[in-house]
UniProtKB/Swiss-Prot annotation:
Residues 1-87 form the Glutaredoxin domain. Has a glutathione-disulfide oxidoreductase activity in the presence of NADPH and glutathione reductase. Reduces low molecular weight disulfides and proteins. One of its GO terms (molecular function) is protein-disulfide reductase activity. GO terms for cellular component: cytoplasm. Belongs to the glutaredoxin family. This is Glutaredoxin. NCBIfam families: GRXA (TIGR02183), PRK11200.1 (NF008401). It is found in: Cytoplasm. GO terms for biological process: cell redox homeostasis; cellular response to oxidative stress. Disulfide bonds join C11-C14.
Length: 87
């Protein structure tokens, strides 16, 4: 499983999503992730909207195996249900 987190500096939800990804990477052999700083990479909200296919209001925007999952709360719910994040 590969997760991509699109975030920006100073965003507490981005930090939290990245921390969850670090936890999962440490707990699971089948998990890895990449954090993409949208400011450093020059990615705009419009770029994300094209990829996701709907308006983007907030970051982080998170993909699991190239499928858009949503933001930090959506990622937490998915990881809790499917990956044992809070076990």
């Amino acid at each position: 499983m590969f997760v991509v987190i699109f975030g920006r500096p100073g965003c507490p939800y981005c930090v939290r999503a990245k921390e969850h990804a670090e936890t999962l990477k440490a707990k699971r052999d089948d998990f890895n992730y990449r954090y993409v700083d949208i400011h450093a990479e020059g990615i705009t909200k419009a770029d994300l909207e094209k990829t996701i296919g709907k308006p983007v209001e907030t970051v982080p925007q998170i993909f699991i195996d190239e499928q858009h999952i949503g933001g930090c709360t959506d990622f937490e719910a998915y990881a809790k249900e499917n990956l044992g994040l809070f076990d």
